[in-house]
């Protein structure tokens, strides 16, 4: 599941309630805690509050984070900031090589810029990092553009498939009009479900300005 939790999850308990209700094995977070000196402890607390284990990310990854359920193994991680113009928000990417049901699976979480030109530079780096991962790979996050945008097309050209539809728009959470949060998959998998995490709409609106995107994936 990918989820932009809004400014470090500042709305508190509703964020945790959304994730616990969705029961993801892997959670990819945008806008996780980033306060200097405190981000690591707060990121771990966030993951634990969701019933998960912090894996990687946080401030060094431009506020992107990976957390996993107890049964998911971690092989390796990589986090980096993406260069931005002076005064622009922090951006970054976090990648993790995981082991799920004895199989290698890669995940990459990103939150792309509001600037269209910057987004293309950033997503190219995302694709480069994702190519280093083995097994099926999930690339997910807030792309800040709709599915007809150039970043989605670049990901699709790199082999990532969008299984979503306009039936699950993600922003703004209270009355979603746009599908700007993506979860794309490459590799030998079957996507059983994509989009709606099955969480009450009022809780989603209380938790964040974005709705999460959940995929149920079978390894084949």
Named regions from a protein language model:
Residues 1-48, 64, 204, 219-220:
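N-terminal, active-site-proximal structural segment of metallo-dependent hydrolase catalytic domains
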Residues 27-30, 56-57, 138-142, 162-165:
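Active-site neighborhood of phospho(di)ester-bond hydrolases with catalytic His/Asp-centered motifs
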Residues 95-100, 106, 120-143, 151-152:
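His/acidic metal-ligating clusters that form di-metal
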Residues 31-104, 193-198:
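Structured beta-strand-rich core segments of catalytic domains in phosphoester-bond hydrolases
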Residues 1-7, 76-78, 95, 104-113:
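Active-site-proximal beta-strand elements of phosphoester/diester hydrolases
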Residues 5, 32, 110-112, 141-143, ...:
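Active-site metal-binding loops of divalent metal-dependent hydrolases
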Residues 72-79, 85, 131-136, 145-220:
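Metal-dependent phosphoester-hydrolase catalytic domains
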Residues 8-10, 33-38, 115-117, 143-150, ...:
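Active-site environment of divalent metal-dependent phosphoester hydrolases
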């Amino acid at each position: 599941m990918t989820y932009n939790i809004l400014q470090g999850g500042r709305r508190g308990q509703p964020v945790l309630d959304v994730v616990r209700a969705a029961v993801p094995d892997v959670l990819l977070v945008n806008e996780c805690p980033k306060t200097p000196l405190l981000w690591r402890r707060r990121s771990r607390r966030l993951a634990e509050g969701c019933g998960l284990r912090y894996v990687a990310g946080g401030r060094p990854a431009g506020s992107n984070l990976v957390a996993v359920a107890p049964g998911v193994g971690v092989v390796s991680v990589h986090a980096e900031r993406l260069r931005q113009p002076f005064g622009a928000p922090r951006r970054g990417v976090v990648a993790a090589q995981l082991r799920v049901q004895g199989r290698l699976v890669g995940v990459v979480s990103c939150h792309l810029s509001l600037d269209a030109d910057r987004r293309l530079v950033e997503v190219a780096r995302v694709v480069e990092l994702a190519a280093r991962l083995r097994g099926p790979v999930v690339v997910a996050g807030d792309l800040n553009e709709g599915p007809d945008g150039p970043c989605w097309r670049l990901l699709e050209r790199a082999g990532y498939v969008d299984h979503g539809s306009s039936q699950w728009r993600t922003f703004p959470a209270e009355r979603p009009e746009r599908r700007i949060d993506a979860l794309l998959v490459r590799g030998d998998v079957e996507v059983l479900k994509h989009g709606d995490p099955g969480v009450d709409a009022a809780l989603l609106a209380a938790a964040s300005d974005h709705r999460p995107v959940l995929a149920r994936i079978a390894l084949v």
